[in-house]
Amino acid sequence: ANNKEDAHEEPTIKRSRSHDYVSREVINVRENVGLIEVANFSKHEFKGTDARKFLDHVMAGKLPKPGRISLSPMLSYRGKLCGDLTVACFDENEFMVFGSGAAQEMHRRWFESHLDKFDVNYKNRSDEFHGISIAGPNSRKVLEKIVRDDVSNEKFKFRDSRRMFVGGVPAIINRISFTGELGYEIYVAPHYQIKLYEELMEAGKEFNIKPFGGRALMSMRLEKNWGAWTLDYRPDFTAKETGLDMFINWDKDFIGKEKAKSENSSSKLTPLIVETNDIDVTNNEAVMNGDQSIGYVTSGGFAHFVNKSVAFTFIDQNKIKSENKIQIEINGDLFNCSVIKEPLYDPSGQKMRS
């Protein structure tokens, strides 16, 4: 908003008055650098000689080597999703798992229920770390001004994780970003959060650093075809249905493996472009093919940088008839849709790896 008096919404089922403000935030991240708080992520710490063995058991994905990060689904015994997590390895006996803050208690109970056969110490450290993410083509330039470590692309690669001082503050830095841009998640103790914010804002002045919010973040992930936990990824769905099976390591044993291997659902997470001018999906809208319902919306909105209305849907692929258009019903009206074949923004992923 331009000022405090301007910071309000007006109830509407169409695009709200904040639409243009969110667009400005997205464009600044894509072209310069932005900053957003990430204190909401959960942080689960595992230490001990069996730390890797334990995580290999509960995680379906391949675990990272020391200094690296991997993305991994976590499955239930029924082969359904119970987590979409980021795993950081500090050394062979120490890991930090980052996940949804909303699901942290569910994940805590799940981890604790499987600890008894392993020599591993587990602690939920979510309240001990807050954090800020910086993202955009100038984010490295900002970081370089307030660290002593070499954070060049050669020395601090995409999906690296390190402990270092940032603006004099001890931090954990993960080189990842939910925006699809070059970016860093910087985690610090809560009492350092304001200091970190001030250091980043001061260092980023010459690069036009500006805060951005959750709506901008969710818009940017739509442009990358990335689902979100509680919306597109949830315990109702399998890894195969959501496309998260691409992260599964089938060469090891893990909870839910046999169920996941035998799963044969024809329902798939399918991103769509929606042909609409002033209204977007939220969730649970019907997806139609002719006069037949073939699925439903799990999330969506406006992808500001590519200027498209996007819907993430679960569609039964066996019900699609090619002679009929795919449409979504929004507020009683049907809107034509087309399937998104590849990410609308930076499909090769070069920007976040640069």
What do these predicted ranges mean?
Residues 1-354:
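Glycine/proline-enriched, intrinsically flexible loops and inter-domain linkers
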